[in-house]
A protein has these predicted regions:
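Glycine-rich, mobile lid/loop segments that gate access to catalytic sites or pores
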Residues: 105-193, 198-201, 378, 386-389, ...
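Internal helix-turn-beta structural module
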Residues: 332-423
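A glycine- and small-aliphatic-rich helix-loop capping segment at beta-alpha/alpha-beta transitions
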Residues: 53-62, 78-80, 101, 105, ...
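Glycine-rich oxoanion-binding loops at beta->alpha junctions
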Residues: 68-109, 152, 157-158
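Gly/Ser/Thr-rich active-site loops/lids in small-molecule metabolic enzymes
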Residues: 132-149, 202-217, 321-347
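Active-site segments that bind and position negatively charged phosphate/pyrophosphate groups
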Residues: 269-349, 358
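An N-terminal, well-structured beta->alpha segment
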Residues: 1-41, 49-50
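Accessory alpha-helical/coil subdomains and C-terminal extensions
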Residues: 176-179, 201-290
Length: 424
């Protein structure tokens, strides 16, 4: 078998992204009746690309407003595209959230609303609840991002501090008919978790949000605590009649990207093991992947080389150092430290939105010589991991993957390629 391992890994990553791109997946899910007036709103890293599809396919009058991350915009003719900050919200996100809410207020039962939702929407559609400031939300968001909290935990807190999340946007649209089309970036593809579920009923409680804040030792102002202890902080609950005409449709999820990559692997002659959506600390998840790789190499279990291990989901990083890098660089650095130059093992870890954390790269690639090459440059994988400096480590090896914004987001993508004769 003749294959360029790094090229194959890059092709797998591209295949995973393409399988979840709005241009490929949205049109088939739009309403059969595409005539008449429709109001389009949206939030997330894929919002602009999704809006382009609606403009292309809709036969009637189209107008609306979507918000996406800075640099993730795309030109639309009828739908306004605004950019704002992610992962920590800014004034632009606050302003557009107010405009979105105004746009859907006072609608009639004859109106139709299309809501285009994707990962990043929680930060991009930032409208603090009464008595809570944007600065409060920014501070709490930053603390959550560094705490190691899961995306579900973070979004539980976010929706209970919001005037637009947790079903509140859907309630504001009543009595119009609402069609939400979502691209999932969360493990389990829960509608209540994707961008904090602005148009779906939410079973979580303010008490749970307070428990999460306590669990991770996050300091909050007295005004925020008072709000979370009030009845008004509760989100829109299942059975609320204001959501009776709100419909939710998942159009892309991480599993279909993993499945598409697996097909590509088999076409190249590699068997695959799909581990699915994973959560946990990036460095610990990497150690599990390393253990599976060693089991394959040493014992041919659970499958024999040549093969590829695929996984997705959203890991977390508890920041202890002052280095640079997102969760995928952290994963790959921990994998490098665990395998220590294991022959015949190559790996890629990247974020399908094209941005790993807050850096300019999507991810990075590890090769069998990464560990030794870095050591020759005076870089210790273990020390750099302690400093959360995955970006700096792989930048020194010229091994960063830079894709620019992809305008979709089905979260992390990881592929470990194991060649035959990989034993030391």
């Amino acid at each position: 078998m003749s294959v360029d391992p790094q090229q194959l890994l890059r092709e797998l990553f591209a295949t995973a992204i393409d399988a979840a791109h709005p241009q490929q997946v949205l049109e088939a899910h739009l309403p059969a009746d595409r005539t008449g007036r429709v109001i389009v709103i949206g939030a997330g890293k894929a919002a602009a690309a999704m809006a382009q599809v609606v403009e292309r396919c809709w036969q009637g009058e189209v107008s609306g407003l979507v918000v996406t991350r800075y640099g993730h915009g795309a030109p639309c003719e009828k739908i306004e595209v605004v950019e704002a900050a992610h992962p920590v919200p800014d004034a632009a996100g606050l302003a557009v959230a107010k405009r979105v809410l105004d746009l859907v207020s006072n609608l009639s039962e004859d109106d139709r609303v299309i809501f285009l939702l994707s990962g990043g929407g929680s930060a991009l559609l930032a409208l603090p609840a009464e008595g809570i400031t944007l600065a409060d939300k920014q501070s709490i968001n930053k603390a959550l991002l560094k705490s190691g909290a899961t995306i579900g935990e973070m979004n539980c807190v976010r929706k209970h501090l919001s005037a637009i999340k947790g079903g509140r946007l859907g309630k504001a649209c009543w009595p119009a008919t609402v069609y939400t089309y979502a691209i999932s970036d969360v493990p389990g593809d829960l509608a209540t978790v994707i961008a904090s579920g602005p148009t779906v009923a939410d079973p979580s409680t303010s008490a749970e949000a307070l428990a999460i804040i306590k669990r991770y030792g996050i300091e909050i102002p007295a005004s925020v605590r008072t709000w979370l202890q009030s009845a008004e902080s509760e989100t829109v609950k299942p059975g609320d009649p204001s959501l009776a005409r709100s419909h939710f449709q998942l159009i892309a999820r991480p599993q279909q990207s993993l499945d598409a990559a697996a097909v590509k692997c088999r076409q190249a002659g590699f068997s695959t093991l799909i581990l699915g959506d994973l959560e946990g600390e990036s460095r610990e998840v990497a150690k599990v992947h390393a253990g599976i790789a060693r089991q394959i190499i040493n014992h041919g279990q659970p499958l024999a080389a040549p093969c590829v291990i695929l996984s997705g989901g959203e890991t977390t990083v508890t920041v202890r150092g002052n280095g640079r890098g997102g969760r995928n660089a952290e994963f790959l650095l921990s994998l490098t430290d665990s395998l220590k130059g294991q022959p015949g093992v190559y790996a890629l870890a990247g974020d399908t939105d094209g941005i790993d954390g807050s850096e300019d790269n999507a991810g990075a690639i590890m090769t069998p010589d990464s560990y030794a090459r870095a050591a020759a440059l005076g870089l210790s994988a273990s020390d750099e991991l302690d400093n959360n400096n995955g970006y700096g480590y792989f930048q020194a090896l010229d091994a960063l993957i830079v894709t620019e914004p992809t305008r979709t987001n089905v979260n992390d993508f990881r592929a470990i390629l194991i060649l035959e004769n990989s034993k030391s």
